[in-house]
UniProtKB/Swiss-Prot annotation:
Organism: Methanothermobacter thermautotrophicus (strain ATCC 29096 / DSM 1053 / JCM 10044 / NBRC 100330 / Delta H)
GO cellular component assignments: ribonucleoprotein complex; ribosome
Protein origin, superkingdom: Archaea
Protein's name according to its UniProt entry: Small ribosomal subunit protein eS31
UniProt KW Phosphoprotein keyword: no
Listed InterPro entries: Ribosomal_eS31, Ribosomal_eS31_arc, Ribosomal_zn-bd
């Protein structure tokens, strides 16, 4: 996936579609797996709310 595909434009501003990894640093995006976000670099996983 290309970096420009991870952003979208809303009201003239760039907005990230996926969060950054809290362990790695800014610039390392987490992958969206439906029920969770996962970092492919360090393996950190963040579960989405199940509401």
């Amino acid at each position: 996936m290309k970096k420009f595909e991870l952003y979208e434009v809303k009201d003239g501003k760039l907005v990230r579609k996926n969060p950054f990894c809290v362990r790695c640093s800014n610039g390392v995006f987490m992958a969206d797996h439906g029920d969770r976000y996962a970092c492919g670099k360090c393996g950190y996983t963040e579960w989405k709310n199940r509401e």
